[in-house]
Amino acid sequence: MTYVDLNEEKTRRLSFYLAMEEWVARHMAEPECFFMWQVEPSVIFGRNQDVYSEVNLDYCRQNGIQVYRRKSGGGCVYADMSNVMLAYITTANEAQTTFDHYLRMVVDVLKQMGIAASWTEHNDIMIGDRKVSGNAFYHVTTSFPAIQAIDGKQTPTETTVGRSIVHGTLLYDTNMRNMVGAITPSDEKMLKHGVQSVRQRICLLKDHTKMTLPEVKAFIRGHLTNQTLTLTPKEVTEIEQLEQEYLSPEWIFGHNPKH
């Protein structure tokens, strides 16, 4: 599998990495691609969610947490620099088959780290009965150059293919108060109760391994990928242009389902 590398140290907005996933799916011909990313405190919510119902926007503004909408379904996710986000792009089309393949790969890597991980029918990765990773899926259709034989002549044309994107979290550590506060009512008592409840339902990778987060990332990359493709400055610029769609207020706030 090919690791897609930015070859830069800086941390970008979450919207850039969403655009990068989509760009890779639409422009790279490799059958399987993978990359990891980290972001400053952010909330990412699903394509069909109502941001005003699902996200505590006041809490996010007060605590410097950015808000983004993704093109996959599913619920709200809080991310910060203490956890890592995984992106997997493949030519496979069927959602559950793609999920199962991806989840099996990640669970197998965690097991090689000595962690007794498993996955559920809801496409979560668990350690025991606690969640360490949530994942979502969406599909894109794109075209690649091809050659077609017409009347005995080789004629340039395009072929339309489907690409699947799976992205998810891997909780190494996190700011639990922000995780809960960003997606729950602002009442202090409810926030405290929410933190306690979340602590009972999720687990942190740091409690199950002696590896640091950079070591975990290196281990995953080393076991899942066998070659690297580094994006060119031109390709990064194209991703930045695509990112503008994800930054549009109309996209973030204007796609709320009708009540």
Feature map (PLM): residue ranges:
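FAD-binding core of FAD-dependent oxidoreductases
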Residues: 70-85, 125-127, 153-158, 164
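A structural signal for small-residue-enriched, beta-sheet-centric alpha/beta enzyme cores
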Residues: 138-141, 158-217
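Active-site loop/lid in soluble adenylation, ligation, and acyl-transfer enzymes
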Residues: 1-52, 137, 199-259
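Active-site cofactor/substrate anionic-group-binding motifs, chiefly glycine-
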Residues: 53-76
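Intrinsic disorder/low-complexity segments
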Residues: 142-160
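Contiguous, small/hydrophobic- and glycine-enriched helical/loop subdomains that border
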Residues: 83-126
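Residues forming anionic-ligand binding surfaces in small-molecule and nucleic-acid pockets
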Residues: 71-90, 188-206
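Short, conserved charged micro-motifs
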Residues: 53-55, 94-99, 178, 212-215
